[in-house]
């Protein structure tokens, strides 16, 4: 193997990524386990070995799914050439995993020459390009660096500061967690109702994800009713968002029984539209970026992944 590019059409890329994520969800459906769930250990955002930058959007979910399926412990990834540049070698027979990057290009001039020009189309087009990456567990000659993990108490303090900086009205009481658009507030059960602090913040971030859709924030359509495709995709989006931020905060994300209500509708949405998971992950990344933007410079520097 000498090339990093994955020569596929956009349709092939959508199908391959979606199929991988569907398989990961189906594999854990019996115990409500998603690709981003871990058994008590902190999750981390996948990073590129050459740039040290975190992957974004659907690539986070895709690489989590790959790591979940293959049992990779570290979230360090690179292309064949990137590993070679570090004097590391991908082992013979190892199967790579797809990541997607988005490129822009000028509209093909040939469209106009053949009378196919649509004057309402933008002058530039966005298209997907696939690359093959390998986990550090698939290479020889590379030792992953030690990843220091802060004491749980300090991670929880950071999570508290992170959520408090969002400027969202958070109230406590009752037995349910939800966001109410009419009053623009998040309602949470009392802290003591949760199994532990990590579970509390995972749910709080989920509900704050819904709150980000208010018109004066990111202005998403929150009108979908329970059971509808729109409702299922909003739930999928904010669940991904919660996992992304928990990874940035180095918190664990574990399976929740209430996912049983959504798994079937998530799978239906993914099977009916190969771009659905790309859309959900893109929206989740947009919310994550907004949440990070609400933090002070000092807080952004202390939160992993908030580049």
Swiss-Prot record:
The lineage of its organism: Bacteria, Pseudomonadati, Pseudomonadota, Alphaproteobacteria, Hyphomicrobiales. One of its GO terms (molecular function) is single-stranded DNA binding. InterPro entries: Antirestriction_ArdC, ArdC_N, MPTase-PolyVal. It comes from the Bacteria. Keywords: Plasmid. This is Uncharacterized protein y4eC.
